[in-house]
UniProtKB/Swiss-Prot annotation:
It comes from Mus musculus. The lineage of its organism: Eukaryota, Metazoa, Chordata, Craniata, Vertebrata. Transmembrane segments: none annotated. Its main location: nucleus. This is Nuclear receptor subfamily 2 group C member 2. One of its GO terms (molecular function) is zinc ion binding. Disruption phenotype: Impaired spermatogenesis. Mutant animals have smaller cerebellums with disruption of lobes VI-VII. They exhibit a delay in monolayer maturation of dysmorphic calbindin 28K-positive Purkinje cells 7 days after birth. Deficiencies in acoustic startle response, prepulse startle inhibition, and social interactions were observed. Also responses to novel environmental situations are inhibited. NR2C1 and NR2C2 double knockout results in embryonic lethality around 7.5 dpc and increased apoptosis. The gene is Nr2c2. Belongs to the nuclear hormone receptor family. NR2 subfamily. Phosphorylation on Ser-19 and Ser-68 is an important regulator of NR2C2-mediated transcriptional activity. Phosphorylation on these residues recruits the corepressor, NRIP1, leading to transcripional repression, whereas the non-phosphorylated form preferentially recruits the coactivator, PCAF.
């Protein structure tokens, strides 16, 4: 019996054997037969080799004797069975490689080919997403792409990625995955795991469309959105949904197709870990939501919850690069003038102290306001990226407010009340100041077209569409007007101070003191404008007249447009106290003690 291209051929068998047995080499493809491993002994009995003996019906046992080879390319196997004492002889002729394989020596003597991960150098498990990689890098790349995660590098974006240090910098690890040939589209084309959607209150829209924007990279104002229906996505609720993608990629594109966002090295120093803010906000939001719901069945043990909060605050503290200062000073202690004017109590009655600032309310350090966008930047900007960018701007704004000595002097309770009342105005001023960095016009244009398509599919009520469209129009109009005025960094800083120290918000205490700080901010802004723009007589009036427009914008819609995709139904107001408590001595101690 022969095969078309046999590696082993049976030349002859002894005809005296009535029911001859057969020697069979079993490969991975041969299954379904009962096999028995037996020992073959040569004629002298000095050596033994194992073979597989089987009969057509899988029954019977036998003894296999390995005889001396008659030629250099042949070996003899002599076997007997329990019901037949006459030995049968099978001569197997093969090449030397097959002989070694038959004797079980090939796998031992021949070195195995081992492939190594092109990303970290660990032992590879195969080719994944277009590159030979290990299970660790395969899983990391898959998670990063599927969850649209964004990372930041604390160094100069050239960290060493190897088996032992691959977890130290996620930014550089993802960057190397892309450089070594891993393809994002290979992950996105896989079948995604079944995800049970939680029921959430309806917000503004329920859509799974993806928005692709074809545009001149140098001109974000002429974007032309194109809608592509995502048939596989589950319906989501909210003005922005996870299936929505916006292409606002920057001109910095590598030859290998990797899209990166150029970051200012100095800004990266002060905002090195801001890429983790989305995770911090999510952790705090989920914890706050669990506490508010009182769901004991899903709550973790108390010590684990405390540990989660500790890690979240520690991450946030590192991200904002807080200094090793002591706890916020009391009114009587005074504040060092390095961050602005020194604070002194000039008079005190039985109720509240009166505070006066010696020197300027703001220093040159308060003028710097550099927002570092997440990177690497995806080709099609998704909701997670928009929310992450917005969270960076929000936290940067609050960090700026906390750095003002006069603000610190008001105390924690007053700080929380002020920020809760004006966070939307501070955030909007930040949007106007960073509109070019964020490509704000492109994002808003995409949202508008997304909402228009929602109207056609009856996903939103007419009243709700009108409210949201009016809000977006007001936001765009405000940003455009500030761009026309060409507001500089000093003017933006003083405008934010005027907004921050607004005494007319309901529920505030110590309004007279807050009003004093606001008046000082207005006077310093006036002095600056008169000295810097002396030829523009009405510049100050044109700037101040823009502030009332901030009060016309709904904080609820701002929250839904920029943050709902990140924190769900948890309000920004509930997160503000966590952020403002970071400067206590407890969390300053954690900054140096814990590692990210």
């Amino acid at each position: 019996m022969t095969s078309p291209s046999p590696r082993i051929q049976i030349i002859s068998t002894d005809s005296a054997v009535a029911s001859p047995q057969r020697i069979q080499i079993v490969t991975d493809q041969q299954t379904g037969q009962k096999i028995q491993i037996v020992t073959a002994v040569d004629a002298s009995g000095s050596s033994k080799q194992q073979f597989i003996l089987t009969s057509p019906d899988g029954a019977g046992t036998g003894k296999v004797i390995l005889a001396s080879p008659e030629t250099s390319s042949a070996k003899q196997l002599i076997f007997t069975t329990s019901d037949n004492l006459v030995p049968g002889r099978i001569q197997i002729v093969t090449d030397s490689a097959s002989v070694e394989r038959l004797l079980g020596k090939a796998d031992v003597q021949r070195p195995q080919v081992v492939e190594y991960c092109v990303v970290c150098g660990d032992k590879a498990s195969g080719r994944h997403y277009g590159a030979v990689s290990c299970e660790g890098c395969k899983g990391f790349f898959k998670r990063s792409v599927r969850k649209n995660l964004t990372y930041s590098c604390r160094s100069s974006q050239d960290c060493i990625i190897n088996k032992h240090h691959r977890n130290r910098c996620q930014f550089c690890r993802l960057k190397k995955c892309l450089e070594m040939g891993m393809k994002m589209e290979s992950v996105q084309s896989e079948r995604k795991p079944f995800d049970v959607q939680r029921e959430k209150p309806s917000n503004c829209a329920a859509s799974t469309e993806k928005i692709y924007i074809r545009k001149d990279l140098r001109s974000p104002l002429i974007a032309t959105p194109t809608f592509v229906a995502d048939k596989d996505g589950a319906r989501q609720t909210g003005l922005l949904d996870p299936g929505m993608l916006v292409n606002i990629q920057q001109p910095l594109i590598r030859e290998d197709g990797t899209v990166l966002l150029a970051a200012d090295s100095k800004a990266e120093t002060s905002q090195g870990a801001l890429g983790t803010l989305a995770n911090v906000v999510t952790s705090l939001a989920n914890l706050s939501e669990s506490l508010n719901n009182g769901d004991a069945s899903e709550m973790q043990p108390e010590d684990q919850s405390a540990s989660e909060i500790t890690r979240a605050f520690d991450t946030l503290a590192k991200a904002l690069n807080t200094t090793d200062s002591a706890s916020p000073p009391s009114l009587a202690d005074g504040i060092d003038a390095s961050g602005g004017g020194s604070i002194h109590v000039i008079s005190r009655d039985q109720s509240t102290p009166i505070i006066e600032v010696e020197g300027p309310l703001l220093s040159d350090t308060h003028v710097t306001f550099k927002l570092t966008m997440p990177s690497p930047m995806p080709e099609y900007l998704n909701v997670h990226y928009i929310c992450e960018s917005a969270s960076r701007l929000l936290f940067l704004s609050m960090h700026w407010a906390r750095s003002i000595p006069a603000f610190q002097a008001l105390g924690q309770d007053c700080n929380t009340s002020l920020v809760r009342a004006c966070w939307n105005e501070l955030f909007t001023l930040g949007l106007a100041q960073c509109a070019q960095v964020m490509s704000l016009s492109t994002i808003l244009a995409a949202i508008v077209n997304h909402l228009q398509n929602s109207i056609q599919e009856d996903k939103l009520s007419g009243d709700r569409i009108k409210q949201v469209m009016e809000h977006i129009w007001k936001l765009q109009e405000f940003c455009n007007s500030m761009a026309k005025l060409d507001i500089d960094g000093y003017e933006y800083a003083y405008l934010k101070a005027i907004v921050l120290f607004s005494p007319d918000h309901p529920g505030l205490t110590g309004t007279s003191q807050i009003e004093k700080f606001q008046e000082k901010a207005q006077m310093e802004l006036q002095d600056y404008v008169q000295k810097t723009y002396s030829e523009d007589t009405y510049r100050l009036a044109r700037i101040l007249v823009r502030l009332p427009a901030l009060r016309l914008m709904s904080s609820n819609i701002t929250e839904e447009l920029f943050f709902t995709g990140l924190i769900g139904n948890v309000s920004i107001d509930s997160i503000i106290p966590y952020i403002l408590k970071m400067e206590t001595a407890e969390y300053n101690g954690q900054i140096t003690g814990a590692s990210l």
